[in-house]
């Protein structure tokens, strides 16, 4: 029997206008935006729907993305489409957990508001960097990085796309070594910090304090965790996995492979952009991939999959 997974993009996919048509057409979406704005004391409609200078700043991006993606999802569910399993890339993992039932929507939104602030300020500006390594096998990258201080793998996105992270000088030196070892390209990324590196541990420590005031709920469906690509069914594990995720590697390719092994053959990416849909095609061409980033797409996908 066919299994459907809802998957959620991470930071970098944000776009002005995300969720606006859902806000206009779905009372559920409208309620999430309005309640979230009150909960975090930000005008999230203005942040998501209007041109502004804040949307690309980490401390605002994260809360905006999770609010928009959850608002879209609740509308999709009201149309009759539901997931058997969820996962999200980095920030998207919070959406995955909320949709799986592990956190209420507002707790997820409040938590990522804090997470964004902590990550924005965890490392001094300019001290860290991230680069995408294209056209090189993960095992070769691991060999090149082995023994190097200050640089590690942030994301295993898909075959031929790995992201490295860490101290700025160490990332630059590793990039040169990777090109010499045969990488097709090494692209420095425009980011505000060395995400998913040990330099983010202070953010993880602060995040752990926030989780002390958050209730985790029994999961209604399983989700797959970034840090270990394992199927999670025990809500008692959520907090530790999310704290570790801030400074650990995101094993996205492995997470998708886990879901496929669990019988998922249909993936629905919910949120702005089609980043994960692109990764899916490189991980396994045999699975069905859909994207919902607009009301029109939601109607079409729900009609096809219900």
Language-model regions, residue ranges each:
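Cys-dependent protein tyrosine phosphatase-like superfamily
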Residues: 1-5, 213-226, 231, 240, ...
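FabD-like malonyl-/acyl-CoA
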Residues: 2-140, 185, 189, 266-296
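Alpha/beta catalytic cores of group-transfer enzymes, especially the acyltransferase/condensing modules
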Residues: 11-13, 38-40, 100-247
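Short, flexible helix/strand-to-coil boundary loops that buttress conserved ligand/catalytic motifs
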Residues: 48, 145, 175, 280, ...
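A short, flexible low-complexity segment enriched in Lys/Arg and Gly/Pro that occurs
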Residues: 64-70, 245-252
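Non-catalytic positions within long, well-ordered alpha-helices that form the structural scaffold/packing
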Residues: 77, 179, 260-263
């Amino acid at each position: 029997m066919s299994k459907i997974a809802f998957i959620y993009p991470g930071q970098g996919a944000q776009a002005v206008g995300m969720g606006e048509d859902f806000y206009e057409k779905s009372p559920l979406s409208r309620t999430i935006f309005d309640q979230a704005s009150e909960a975090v004391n930000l005008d999230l409609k203005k942040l998501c729907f209007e041109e502004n200078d804040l949307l690309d700043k980490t401390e605002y991006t994260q809360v905006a993305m999770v609010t928009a993606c959850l608002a879209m999802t609740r509308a999709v569910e009201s149309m009759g489409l539901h997931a058997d399993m969820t996962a999200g890339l980095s920030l998207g993992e919070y959406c995955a957990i909320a949709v799986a039932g592990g956190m209420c929507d507002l707790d997820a939104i409040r938590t990522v508001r804090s997470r964004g602030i902590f990550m924005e300020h965890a490392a001094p500006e300019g001290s860290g960097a991230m680069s995408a390594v294209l056209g090189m096998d993960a095992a070769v990258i691991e060999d090149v990085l082995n023994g190097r201080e200050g640089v590690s793998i942030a994301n295993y996105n898909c075959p031929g796309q790995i992201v490295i992270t860490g101290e700025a000088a160490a990332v630059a030196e590793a990039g040169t070594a990777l090109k010499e070892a045969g990488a097709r390209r090494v692209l420095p990324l425009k980011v505000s910090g060395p995400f998913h590196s040990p330099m983010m541990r202070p953010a993880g420590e602060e995040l752990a304090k926030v989780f002390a005031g958050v209730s985790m709920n029994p999961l209604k469906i399983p989700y797959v965790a970034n840090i270990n690509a394992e199927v999670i069914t025990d809500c008692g594990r959520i907090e530790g996995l999310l704290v570790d995720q801030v400074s650990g590697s995101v094993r996205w390719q492995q997470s998708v492979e886990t879901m496929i092994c669990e019988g998922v053959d249909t993936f629905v990416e919910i949120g702005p952009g089609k980043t994960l849909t692109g990764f899916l095609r490189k991980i396994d061409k045999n699975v069905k991939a859909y994207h919902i980033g607009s009301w029109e797409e939601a109607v079409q996908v729900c009609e096809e999959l219900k």
